[in-house]
Amino acid sequence: MGATLDGVKVVDLEVHSDVRGSFVEYFRQSWLPTDHAALQGNVSRSTPGVLRGMHFHRRQWDYWFAVSGAAFVALADLRSGSPTERATMTMRLAADEPRGLFIPSGVAHGFLSESEFVLGYLNDRYFDGSDEFGFAWNDSSLGIDWPTADPILSDRDRANPSMAEALRVAVPYHR
């Protein structure tokens, strides 16, 4: 795992196994560094080589966990005044190494699926298109070392502007 970002929290999840199989508790509100409760849960399925990102929100936090498969995850702190402003962090999120990942608002996120990947995620707000922003996954100002130069992208992610342009459009996050 790369350097940590202010407010980002990685939770090592405990696996309980016996002859029947296994059990993992993926989420407890008390694990998160926020009083805002989770309001919406989602599941995203990606084929190998899919890159989703970079995306960010001004108001919403995310809590991610791998349901199956694995992905390379990249985060970038866009928060003005944050002690880790413009810093990045990378890590692997995998079902066979269960971890939860808390991503505060103002921290951009993206992932590249290494395999068939199912991501479960919770948010503290209901979906609101006015709080969905994105920028180019390979923006050179961040220097993220993605494991591929030719990912499978959605039309939306392929058309994303530079980070600088995205931040001009989105009212910047302030701590």
PLM feature spans:
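Non-catalytic, conserved peripheral segments adjacent to functional cores
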Residues: 1-99, 117, 121-175
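Short beta-strand His + acidic residue motifs that chelate non-heme Fe in jelly-roll/DSBH
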Residues: 101, 109-114
